[in-house]
Amino acid sequence: MSEQVKEPFVFVIFGASGDLSRRKLIPAMYHLASLGYLPQKYAVAGTSRTEMSDERLRELVRDAIQVHSKEEDAGASADASASLRFVYYQSGDTTKPQSVAALKTRLDQLDKEMGLKGNRLFYLAVAPDLVRDIIKNLDAAGMLEQAEGSWVRVVFEKPFGHDLQSARELNAALRRVLHEDQIYRIDHYLGKESVQNILTFRFGNAIFEPIFNRTHVNNIRITVAETIGMEGRRGAYYDTAGALRDIVQNHALQLLCLIAMEAPASFDAESIRDEKVKVLRSLVPMSVKEVEASTVRGQYKGYRGEEGVDPKSTTETYAALQTTIENWRWSGVPIILQTGKKMRRKFTNIEIEFNQPPLCLFREFAECPPNPNSLEVRIQPNEGISLSFVCKQPGTKYAVQDVKMDFSYSGSFEQRSPEAYERLLLEALHGDASLFTRSDEVELAWRFISSINEGWSKLPPPPFPNYEPATQGPAEASRFLNPTQTRRQ
């Protein structure tokens, strides 16, 4: 990861009593502190509507570290929160100006007492409909201004908007009070080690990059499959979003950008994001006819009975689509994106299937054509990369067989891989936005996704529910998932 943060700072969590704070943010800060990445002077300040004292938040910190930390010794720590050095809490409804004023007073006090130099990282772990009011109040209180020699940055969780129009409005509202280099739109997939390795694998190895194009690649498949449903936590939100907005608009499209983009001019935030934007700009929005022919949506049996879900809901818990990237490198190559809840197994991967050789030389000894070569990038679990190819079987009889060459992170490296939120928080503290999305990225992703949602709104809804839990999704999706049907001829 990056080097140690040198400058003092205060990390302010909005929604500090919530699930994301307990499961991800607090354990991430603990690990950064225990591994020596944080400076001597820093503080963690939480705020939410829940009434509690500083000491009560410290108890929650200890509990969160013991329950959610993946460090072997986290639970054995006599006082895990001591690694965070200073933890404070300010209760209040930050959609109200008076609560933000009280928070400002508390942060100014911490600045003065601890010498934090006005450096602040705000993390908005709150419901999307609260974001604009909170930002408005922070601006009115002067808390977004950067004094000379100090910095203020704001991290925004997904979803960033609900469609193209709302994303544009939110971006415009933020640009009125923040500079783009203060805005950190988080997608936790970009913090995963296996995702960051994609660019290294592509542009650090001369044997692979020359064949990543329409001449050699037959199709690309990206799958984000989950075995869980709502689990009683997200029903109300999810029922207004669905699989397409929740996963494809961000995680799946970000993976597509990394696997399909051109080499950046340099390995800095703007150069990388410039190339990702070019990929998104090459995704042509779909017409209603194309949506009908090239997408499938599903809903698992039992979804309508989940807490917070409309009993007559037509929200999709599964989405699959086929598209193309209309640029010189990829034109005509089928791109298949798939995501779903309550699937047979949990995994995220990218599969690249290559074209067949021009002539099958082994037709006398084996089935022709043989299975095509393929490259699988495993994002989770068992992070790694596999290359499948054809090999001659040992023996006097000439026969061929598919084999795999495999790289696994756990088998190749002894050191612990940082959790996604550890990496992302550390990069935000350093002011490096390479792993965060830019405003034009967000809007171009929504441009493509909104065309599909608009198409669905004009088509009759499918007969939901249309797939059983612990399956591969609706039967109709087989036309995308069967390689012989999606393969470019």
Name each model-derived stretch.
Residues 1-156, 160-489:
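Secretory/organelle targeting and membrane-embedding segments
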